[in-house]
Structure formats: structure tokens, C-alpha cells
Curated annotation (Swiss-Prot):
<dbReference type="InterPro" id="IPR015421">
    <property type="entry name" value="PyrdxlP-dep_Trfase_major"/>
</dbReference>
<dbReference type="InterPro" id="IPR015422">
    <property type="entry name" value="PyrdxlP-dep_Trfase_small"/>
</dbReference>
<dbReference type="GO" id="GO:0005737">
    <property type="term" value="C:cytoplasm"/>
</dbReference>
<dbReference type="InterPro" id="IPR015424">
    <property type="entry name" value="PyrdxlP-dep_Trfase"/>
</dbReference>
<comment type="function">
    <text>Soluble hydrogenase catalyzes both production and consumption of hydrogen from suitable artificial electron donors or acceptors. This subunit catalyzes the tritium-exchange activity.</text>
</comment>
<keyword id="KW-0663">Pyridoxal phosphate</keyword>
<dbReference type="GO" id="GO:0008453">
    <property type="term" value="F:alanine-glyoxylate transaminase activity"/>
</dbReference>
<dbReference type="InterPro" id="IPR024169">
    <property type="entry name" value="SP_NH2Trfase/AEP_transaminase"/>
</dbReference>
<keyword id="KW-0963">Cytoplasm</keyword>
<dbReference type="InterPro" id="IPR000192">
    <property type="entry name" value="Aminotrans_V_dom"/>
</dbReference>
<dbReference type="GO" id="GO:0019265">
    <property type="term" value="P:glycine biosynthetic process, by transamination of glyoxylate"/>
</dbReference>
<dbReference type="InterPro" id="IPR020578">
    <property type="entry name" value="Aminotrans_V_PyrdxlP_BS"/>
</dbReference>
<comment type="subunit">
    <text>Heterodimer of a large and a small subunit.</text>
</comment>
<dbReference type="GO" id="GO:0016491">
    <property type="term" value="F:oxidoreductase activity"/>
</dbReference>
<dbReference type="GO" id="GO:0004760">
    <property type="term" value="F:L-serine-pyruvate transaminase activity"/>
</dbReference>
<comment type="similarity">
    <text>Belongs to the class-V pyridoxal-phosphate-dependent aminotransferase family.</text>
</comment>
<dbReference type="Pfam" id="PF00266">
    <property type="entry name" value="Aminotran_5"/>
</dbReference>
Length: 384
């Protein structure tokens, strides 16, 4: 049944019914006073979610658009940048830097493992003669289910003194605390189809005063993604280009839901769902791709043995209409990924684990005790 479909992927994530109803409203003029009022309310709500007093700009784009904007607005061709690469999205930001003619130095870790903060210190210390202009880090690496130690990496960047820190928080913002002001994060990009609980189409970029100073001398080409245009219009509660008006309706409703739950409760819920999911996979003897010490609260990657990952995904969809994410690039067919991001609760985890047990049995996987996964998840959920 199509109306019973479950999205257990890291994006797009499930959308609450109240948000869907907001999407169904008649559009309004994006140059109207009514839209300006919505923009003003969104500005305050977005700052609350970002834990910042910095400007947070809203673009009609994806998370990749947010990150490209976050890179090109503050740098010039030939600038030295350091990019952390331990998955598909860290690699992507390196590709963006290469495309714009930046001098890109990559700090790498194997997929499934976190970046080593000390590697950033060593590289930045070696750049004293020609300092790096920016360090680009993916907080939650969606492709592998790894969360990087952003706080520790940021400490090394701050000790360096000059470099901006540019953060991909696409699957961390709204799932784990990203205290932008407390940590002094300069540029933070995210997308609406993740922790925001609304469909794809909006991107968000938080910009610090230090980054705006860099903007004044940055010369990389930009037009639609020129954040200066968005800043100027945001001050008047409008946008430089036509926005997806109904997504702003949805964002307003979603932010009201999040504020009613509270930031700490949101973070605790994601932590609890992650722990329940990982406990279930261990009980089913399904190897986890990332260690507990670096597990992302947004997504769990599983590397099954004795049963094909793609067969699991296919049968989960066919039998139960539950969508799981697959592996990307060289991990395609090697892992499957369970999203527990955004509008996901205890019932969703228990339903997904129960369905997974049935699928494993149907595929002939016998290395588990029936009911063990559900029991393990239930224990976590009942005590957390």
C-alpha cells in the first residue's frame, strides 16, 4: 500500500502530517507582506535551531548547494584549503574546491572511520608560511554513518587563528548539537530534507562575522549562490530570487514542532534511536560499519555477512514498503543504511527491525534468534 510507505533513509526523511497539510495550502506572493512575516518568523526559528546569533540564510537549493555556496563566497582562486575526506560527501567538497581552482589538501581516513583531529593540527602547523584560508569538514558523514569529532577539529582550526571552518552539517543539524556560537563555527550548511522534517528544496547557510569579512575580498565567481544578495534581502525579510513558497509554510510548521519538543529532547531522541538500532543489529549478528565511538545519531550503516545487502533492501521494500538506503560508490552492494533522522520515533525503529527479521529469515539468513533484534531495541527504548 503506497500510503503505508516508510522512509528509513537519511533523506528525504519522513514528513509529519501537519507539515504535509501546510504544503497543500494555496501559494502566496513571495513579494507580499504576508510572506515577509513568514520570513521574519523563519529567521528567528532557524537561528534557534542553529544555536546562533549569526545570520542564517535560506536558499532554494539542496544541501550540496548550501555547501557550494559556503565555499565559493569566502575564497579566491588559488587559496589553500584543507578538506577532510572519509566518505562520499567529504570527497564531494574536495571536488567542489578543485572545480573552482582552489589549492586543495585532503586529510583522509578510510571510509567507516573518523577523521583524526591531530592530522588537522599537523597540516595546519605546516602551513605557517602560506596559511590555509579554510578547513572544510563533514560533521556527520551520511555515506558511512560516521560522525567526526568536529569540536576537536575546530579547536585546532581556532589555534591556527586564520582559517575559516566550513562545516557540512547536512545530517547532523537537528540530530545532534551543533553549537555554532559556542564553538565559533564560521560557515555551516544544511538541507531541508534531513532533520528539518520537510521535503527537499531549501538549503541553509549560517555565516559568522569573520566569514563576512572574508566575503569582502573573495573573488570566486558566483551569481545565484551569492550570499551577499541573500543577506541584503533577508534584512528586508525577502529573497533575491523566487523561493518555493510552500516549503516556507512547511518549514514554519516543522520549526514549531521542533520548538515544542525542545532541542535537548530532540538530541536525546536521536541518540536513543541510534542506540536501539545498533543494539538490534548486534543482536541479529549483522556487523556495523562504524564503531560505537564514532556512530552518527542520524544513520546506521550495516555490512551484512551471509546475506546480500541489496537483497535485504529489495525485499524490505517489496514485502513491507520500507525503504532502506544502499551503499554509495565502492560500498554499493556492500552495506545498507537505516535512517533514524528527523520525524522518526520508537515505533518506527521497532517496525523496521521486526520487518528486517522477517526479511532475513525469508532470505535464508539463520545466524540469529528470531525476535532478538526487536527485544534488543525494545530494551534500549524502554530504559533510555
Amino acid at each position: 500500500m503506497q500510503d503505508k510507505a516508510m522512509l528509513m533513509i537519511p533523506g528525504p526523511t519522513p514528513v509529519p502530517e501537519s507539515v504535509l497539510l501546510s504544503l497543500g495550502k494555496h501559494p502566496i506572493g513571495h513579494r507580499s507582506g504576508e510572506f515577509s512575516q513568514i520570513m521574519a518568523a523563519m529567521t528567528a526559528g532557524i537561528k534557534w535551531l542553529h544555536q546562533t546569533q549569526n545570520e542564517v540564510l535560506i536558499l532554494a537549493a539542496s544541501g550540496t548547494g548550501a555547501m557550494e555556496a559556503g565555499i565559493i563566497n569566502f575564497l579566491s582562486a588559488g587559496d589553500r584549503v584543507v578538506v577532510g575526506c572519509n566518505g562520499k560527501f567529504g570527497d564531494r567538497w574536495g571536488e567542489v574546491c578543485d572545480a573552482y581552482g582552489l589549492t586543495t589538501e585532503r586529510i583522509s581516513a578510510p571510509w567507516g572511520q573518523p577523521l583524526n583531529p591531530d592530522d588537522f593540527k599537523a597540516v595546519l602547523d605546516g602551513h605557517r608560511q602560506k596559511p590555509s584560508k579554510a578547513v572544510i569538514v563533514t560533521h556527520s558523514e551520511t555515506s558511512t554513518g560516521v560522525i567526526n569529532d568536529l569540536e576537536a577539529i575546530n579547536r585546532h582550526v581556532k589555534a591556527h587563528g586564520q582559517a575559516l571552518i566550513i562545516v557540512d552539517a547536512v545530517t547532523s543539524l537537528g540530530a545532534v548539537s551543533v553549537p555554532i556560537d559556542e564553538w565559533g563555527l564560521d560557515v555551516v550548511g544544511s538541507g531541508s530534507q534531513k532533520g528539518y522534517m520537510i521535503p527537499p528544496g531549501l538549503a541553509f547557510v549560517s555565516v559568522s562575522p569573520k566569514a563576512w569579512e572574508a566575503y569582502k575580498t573573495a573573488t570566486l565567481p558566483k551569481f545565484y549562490l551569492d550570499l551577499g544578495k541573500y543577506r541584503k534581502d533577508a534584512a528586508k525579510h525577502t529573497t533575491p530570487f523566487t523561493p518555493p513558497v510552500n516549503l516556507f509554510f512547511a518549514l514554519k510548521t516543522a520549526l514549531e514542532m521542533m520548538q515544542a519538543e525542545g532541542l535537548e529532547a530532540i538530541f536525546q531522541r536521536h541518540q536513543r534511536l541510534m542506540q536501539a538500532t545498533r543494539a538490534a543489529m548486534k543482536a541479529l549478528n549483522l556487523p556495523l560499519y562504524a564503531a560505537d565511538s564514532c556512530a552518527s545519531p542520524a544513520i546506521t550503516a550495516v555490512a551484512p555477512q551471509g546475506v546480500e545487502a541489496e537483497n535485504i533492501r529489495s525485499l524490505m521494500k517489496k514485502r513491507f514498503d520500507i525503504a532502506l538506503a544502499g551503499g554509495q560508490d565502492h560500498l554499493k552492494g556492500q552495506i545498507f543504511r537505516i535512517g533514524h533522522l528527523g520525524f522518526v520515533g520508537d515505533r518506527d525503529i521497532l517496525a523496521a527491525v521486526s520487518a528486517l527479521e522477517a526479511v532475513l529469515a525469508e532470505l535464508g539468513y539463520t545466524n540469529f534468534t528470531p525476535g532478538a533484534g526487536v527485544a534488543a531495541a525494545s530494551r534500549v527504548l524502554s530504559t533510555a
